Amino acid sequence: MGRIIGIDLGTTNSCVAVLDGGKARVLENAEGDRTTPSIIAYTADETLVGQSAKRQAVTNPTNTVYAIKRLIGRRFKDDEVQRDVDIMPFKIISADNGDAWVEAQGKKMAPPQISAEILKKMKKTAEDFLGEEVTEAVITVPAYFNDSQRQATKDAGRIAGLEVKRIINEPTAAALAYGIDKKQGDNIVAVYDLGGGTFDISIIEIDSVDGEQTFEVLATNGDTHLGGEDFDNRMIKYLADEFKKEQGLDLRNDPLAMQRLKEAAEKAKIELSSTTQTEVNLPYITADATGPKHLVVKITRAKLESLVEDLIKRSLEPLKVALADADLSVSDINEVILVGGQTRMPKVREEVSAFFGKELRQDVNPDEAVAIGAAVQAGVLSGDVKDVLLLDVTPLSLGIETMGSVMTKLIEKNTTIPTKASQTFSTADDNQSAVTIHVLQGERKQSSGNKSLGQFNLEGIEAAPRGMPQIEVAFDIDADGILHVSATDKKTGKAQNITIKASSGLSDEEVEAMIRDAEAHADEDAKFEELVKSRNQADGMVHATKKQIEEAGEALPADEKEKIEAAMANVETAVKGNDKEAIEKSTQELMEASSKLMEIAQAKAQAEQGQPEGEAKSAKPEDDVVDAEFEEVKDDKK
């Protein structure tokens, strides 16, 4: 069995870890970084992921996709998506089934397809370290992700060529990372996870009995559209408003300027965690008839705090709900762990510390803890980590729509998973031969206020007065938190195998098509790498030849020089194209044409090695070297 890796698929950054010698180890990517920006750029030639995509974002804003996690498993008409449509430089569109998709380089793409590019980078990082192919992974998601978002994350894994062995909640993973080496007795920890795009709070009890550790999630809550990106957007809005006030120009209509503004806002926000004032200085941000315009704005930590005060307060509300759901008070919490890059902001730490009335743990790396926890869970699944039991919960209630557009819950939120539940329902009309079962997820009484997970029909019900037929609906949640639903007509005793036709998400056929597309791109990428290699070799050959021509000077006959220059021109023309064979052929021809030049260079080198009269003979071979002892003679005249 191959190794199972742990991946933190983040909104802003992603991270991969693996068990190495029994310890979870975060792996460095090809650029030498322990985290990879969750940014994907589409160019005419290739797909860039991570730092290389981030570097070119300013010049290619409409085809550079970031924070894709905010769209995964969401409908285009969702309020959260509509908020992003206006501020993202790339184009968010509605797919045929109503899902939120992205359009880049004229191609329409599903969020799982884009997320798969990040997962492929994580997979490659692990393969480079392990020296073997990786096909299995544990992937983390926000605890408050609904069924559609979890399904979409698993789809992303499949498209990337990974079998997702387990979907694990991010705060639970962080608690695993924190508690795995701490063998003391019972401990109740609160994990406050404020990442790039999502927020979670989980209350987790860590028990250690007879060497076995149990991590039991007591309650979880959160907001899947609250994170560092929202903090950045407040800063961007402030800077754009200040510029408009001063210059009368609205930068929001210029994608290039907005991308520069985004980078500057993020940088300023990070700086203000360690300093009390910073300056955003963007020369030539735009221009009008009077000439170029520059943006120079001083911003203090206090100003930033006032811009995001309501966002921080918003994160405290789920804390109250989670504590109430767990039937605990703040005094029952032993430790508070902060996870996610946005928790580095001093004001966030201050507010969370004040809420719980205690000091925060400083020994957890907010960027790496989740990936480490995922690697530990991977070790549990593979049998490498023993005596660890993880009991997670479903974050939201699950049920079906019943008469009067009411949601009837079958499984309450914060129920330990995996779990099963069933309930018997009946018909609303006389002689009704079919019922539609509408599956919902959420906490509202009115069905329209909840997330629709899909619906299906149970047909062939025998004619009977209303209320007589007995229809049993069974819900089954697996360890990934993903729901399976079945319905049975108890009168006939015949269970019908019914699959929910999801109202959103990718069909199996679409996922398979995307897997094939990804495989085709893998071949394309390999060919592109080979092409670049050939180009580099050709460029190197031309550069070396030009240098040798200069050094040869008059020693190179004119007709030979002409022949070589013609061959060099052919190489330079071939390099501009995409024909690898043509590049290699022209490079070979240049090598052959340069044979006379090589002879001259070799003759010159040999001449330089020869020794003119009067010079000392070359040193003997090392075997003839005689060791001598020297005695230091002091100069008394010093």
Curated annotation (Swiss-Prot):
Coiled coil: none
Pfam family, one: HSP70
InterPro entries given in the database record: ATPase_NBD (IPR043129), Chaperone_DnaK (IPR012725), Heat_shock_70_CS (IPR018181), HSP70_C_sf (IPR029048), HSP70_peptide-bd_sf (IPR029047), Hsp_70_fam (IPR013126)
Biased composition (Basic and acidic residues): 614-623
Swiss-Prot/TrEMBL induction comment: By stress conditions e.g. heat shock.
GO molecular function, one term: ATP binding
Record keywords, A-Z: ATP-binding, Chaperone, Nucleotide-binding, Phosphoprotein, Stress response
Residues carrying Phosphothreonine: 198
UniProt region (Disordered), positions on chain: 601-638
Chain intervals with Acidic residues compositional bias: 624-638
Family: Belongs to the heat shock protein 70 family.
Purpose of the protein: Acts as a chaperone.
Protein name, entry field: Chaperone protein DnaK
Organism annotation: Shewanella halifaxensis (strain HAW-EB4)
Lineage of producing organism: Bacteria, Pseudomonadati, Pseudomonadota, Gammaproteobacteria, Alteromonadales
